[in-house]
Regions:
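Conserved alpha/beta cores of soluble small-molecule-handling proteins
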Residues: 1-143
Length: 143
C-alpha cells in the first residue's frame, strides 16, 4: 500500500477552517449552542457539532424538548424541563447536571443567542463513549 493518498488527512486547524467554510445558508438561524462536551456556549454554527460516538447519533438514545423564547422571555420553561427530565428518566439517561443548572444553561444559551423571539431546542443524550449497543460504554450523558 502506498504512503500517499488523495484523500486529505487534516490537521485540527485545517478541519476547523473547513468547518467554517462549510457552513450552509440555512445555518443563519443557528444562534447559540451549549455543549457539555466543550463545557460552554458557542455562537459560531461551524462549532455546533456532536461527536460521532455520541449515542444520540448512532443509537438515537436521547430525549429533547423545545421551549419558546418570546419578547426575550422563555415561555413555560419549567414545565418543559419537567417533561424533559421525565423523558430522560424513562429513557434511562442520567442527568449530567442538576435541574437548576440545566435551567441556568438554557437561560444562558438563550441570552447568548441575542434573540428576543426564537425556538430554544435542547437535548439530553446518553453521551459519547463508543459504537456498541449499550449505554454502559458511555463516559457520561451530554446536554
Amino acid at each position: 500500500m502506498s504512503n500517499t493518498t488523495r484523500t486529505p488527512v487534516l490537521t485540527a486547524p485545517d478541519a476547523i477552517q473547513r468547518l467554517q467554510a462549510g457552513v450552509h445558508a440555512k445555518a443563519q438561524n443557528f444562534y447559540a449552542m451549549y455543549s457539555s462536551v466543550l463545557g460552554g456556549i458557542v455562537t459560531e454554527p461551524a462549532l455546533m457539532v456532536i461527536p460521532l460516538d455520541d449515542h444520540m447519533v448512532h443509537r438515537g438514545h436521547a430525549v429533547f424538548d423545545t421551549a419558546t423564547l418570546t419578547h426575550g422571555m422563555l415561555y413555560q420553561l419549567d414545565p418543559h424541563l419537567d417533561r424533559l427530565l421525565r423523558s430522560a428518566e424513562s429513557a434511562r439517561i442520567p442527568l449530567p447536571f442538576e435541574r437548576g443548572e440545566l435551567r441556568e444553561i438554557v437561560f444562558d444559551t438563550a441570552a447568548a443567542s441575542r434573540q428576543s423571539d426564537a425556538s430554544v431546542r435542547y437535548w439530553l443524550s446518553a453521551g459519547p463513549g463508543g459504537f456498541g449497543l449499550g449505554p454502559g460504554e458511555c463516559v457520561g450523558s451530554s446536554f
